Amino acid sequence: MLVNQIIPMEVKERICVHCDKTDDNGNPTTYLIAGKQQGKSTEAIRQAVFRRDIILSTEYDFFRSAGMKHACNAAPGEVCHLGLRDIFSENFNINHLKRNSGAVHVCVDNARTVLEELLTDRFNTPIRIDYMSLEA
């Protein structure tokens, strides 16, 4: 179910979530993706996360190309790409996320729980996503 809200997080920051993988025709493949496609199941998201296929991004052009309003705080041309391999690496600094905040965009109802669990485990502190945002 798509809602048009902003997401407060316990870390007081917001994150844009999408997958930048494409098929042979250049079409996006969805694990988590902002836009008009329907999302996959919770388990598909979980598997994608463990394969490190999900990207956290505040890239302006991605949202523009998806036909969406610019929901991030990033200025035009400002890009922050973070693969999950970066987030789960030992030397990842949570302050990098805080400097590059945007909005969370997910396509699956249960994705919130999956992301909360993963981020909570990674940062060893409770992360709560109150509600999600998808702007078509």
PLM region descriptions:
Residues 16-19, 72, 80, 107:
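Generic recognition of cysteine residues
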Residues 25-94:
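Conserved P-loop
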Residues 2, 10, 15, 67-72, ...:
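Hydrophobic, Leu/Ile/Phe/Ala-enriched alpha-helical segments that form helix-helix packing faces
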Residues 66-67, 103, 136:
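Broad hydrophobic/π-residue packing in well-ordered secondary structure
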Residues 128-136:
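A short, conserved beta-to-alpha structural element at the edge of catalytic cores
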Residues 37, 45, 53, 110-112, ...:
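Generic hydrophobic/packing signal
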Residues 76-128:
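Conserved RecA-like ASCE ATPase "motif II neighborhood" in helicase/translocase motors
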Residues 1-28, 42:
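Pre-Walker A adenine-sensing motif
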